[in-house]
């Protein structure tokens, strides 16, 4: 049995964790008080935040699984303030995590653009790696809508770089900007994106801890996530009775519409993959699955496959590591502009203010 820890850090991470618990508890707001989570593994969940109101809004996460970092009321998207808050409270945070026991797999779910999540997460991963030396630690990094503002863009750029520098075991990217086009307005986009992430993570956890006809395990997952850029994404597709073709289901799980971050597999943007196929035995033709997996190796360097017999139409989860990420290059170009824009605005405002002050340089107060 796998021991899994899921940390939701900051508002975005908290909401993804709440979506995980909603699906794990079965969707009832009251279920968290009397039901057991529907995990095959031992899974611990903790929502961490500096803003207590963000924790209060969670509907499916039990009170014991909410950790408020005291003496802070959010950090106002200021990563410097957030880092200071983490260092001042790190022992309290890590002690709460260590109470939950040992873990084989740790997910750190966060927005890379806000305040608490983007400042806490790289530092937390660094500390967790020292304390859980044998655990696989993977951040779920949510990229911002590009129109959210200059501060969020610069936060995203620095947080992503720091997550790579602390040497997490790969990183799963989720791109709000990309996924928004499937969800309409921003409010409904947030809910849909959180649900999509939760669905894929729960499928992954279940697959890693299931008896399989063809086996993939945590070691395979780690190998995939450490490939290429050490950044990856998750894809998903569920077939129906009208079109239960297993080969089509595998293909569709790799199409951009099913991915959390856009990757053109046919153009060689994926370096490694783990494909997990689940469904009733009648749909799972091993020869057809093998042929499709072999065809994928023409564009993907190495593909692990797992087959899980479970009643229902085929469902496919794809885990991809990225060889190229043009969208990230574009994000960093925008972040560079955002940083320069912020600096110029500050300099301009200060210059205007000092010019105003100069008008009274030769004057004294008169009463």
From Swiss-Prot:
Record keywords: Cell shape, Cytoplasm, GTP-binding, Nucleotide-binding
Name the residues that bind GTP: 11-15, 111, 115-117, 148, 176, 194
Name a biological process GO annotation: regulation of cell shape
A UniProt-annotated Pfam family:
Tubulin
Tell me yes or no: is Cytoplasm among this UniProt entry's keywords: yes
- Where it mainly occurs, coarsely classed, is cytoplasm
SUPFAM superfamilies from the UniProt entry: Tubulin nucleotide-binding domain-like (SSF52490)
> What would be an example GO MF term here?
GTPase activity
Q: Which InterPro entries match?
A: CetZ, FtsZ/CetZ, Tubulin/FtsZ_GTPase_sf, Tubulin_FtsZ_GTPase
Which cellular component terms (GO) are annotated to the entry? cell division site; cytoplasm
Q: Where in the cell is it found?
A: Cytoplasm
Annotated family: Belongs to the CetZ family.
Q: What does this protein do?
A: Involved in cell shape control.
Q: What is this protein called?
A: Tubulin-like protein CetZ
Which organism is this protein's natural source? Methanothrix thermoacetophila (strain DSM 6194 / JCM 14653 / NBRC 101360 / PT) (Methanosaeta thermophila)
Q: What is the lineage of its organism?
A: Archaea, Methanobacteriati, Methanobacteriota, Stenosarchaea group, Methanomicrobia
């Amino acid at each position: 049995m796998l021991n899994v820890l899921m940390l939701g850090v900051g508002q975005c991470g908290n909401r993804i964790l709440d979506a995980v618990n909603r699906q794990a508890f079965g969707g009832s707001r009251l279920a968290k008080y009397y039901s057991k989570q529907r995990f095959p593994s031992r899974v611990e969940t903790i929502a961490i935040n500096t803003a207590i109101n963000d924790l209060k809004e969670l509907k499916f996460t039990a009170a014991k699984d909410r950790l408020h970092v005291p003496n802070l009321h959010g950090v106002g998207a200021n990563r410097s303030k957030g880092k200071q808050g983490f260092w001042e409270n790190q022992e309290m945070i890590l002690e709460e995590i260590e109470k939950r026991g040992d873990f084989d797999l740790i997910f750190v779910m966060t927005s890379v653009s806000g305040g608490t999540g983007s400042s806490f997460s790289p530092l937390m991963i660094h500390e967790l790696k020292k304390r859980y030396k044998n655990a696989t630690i993977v951040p779920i990094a949510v990229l911002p809508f590009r129109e959210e503002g200059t501060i969020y863009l610069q936060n995203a750029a620095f947080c992503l770089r720091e997550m790579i520098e602390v040497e997490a075991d790969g990183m799963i990217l989720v791109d709000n900007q990309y996924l928004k086009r499937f969800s309409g307005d921003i409010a409904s986009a947030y809910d849909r994106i959180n649900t999509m992430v939760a669905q894929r993570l729960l499928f992954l956890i279940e697959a890693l801890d299931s008896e399989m006809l063809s086996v993939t395990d945590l070691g395979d997952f780690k190998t995939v996530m450490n490939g290429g850029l050490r950044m990856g994404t998750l894809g998903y597709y569920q077939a129906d009775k009208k079109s239960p073709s297993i080969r089509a289901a595998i293909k569709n799980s790799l199409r951009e519409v099913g991915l959390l971050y856009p990757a053109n597999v046919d153009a060689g943007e994926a370096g490694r993959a783990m494909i997990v196929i689940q469904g009733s035995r009648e749909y799972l033709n091993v020869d057809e699955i093998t042929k499709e997996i072999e065809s994928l190796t023409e564009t993907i360097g190495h593909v692990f496959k797992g087959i899980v017999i479970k009643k229902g139409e085929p469902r496919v989860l794809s885990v991809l590591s990225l060889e190229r990420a043009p969208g990230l290059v574009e994000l960093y170009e925008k972040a560079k502009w955002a940083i320069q824009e912020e600096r110029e605005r500050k300099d301009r405002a200060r210059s205007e203010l000092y010019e105003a002050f100069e008008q009274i340089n030769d004057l004294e107060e008169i009463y």
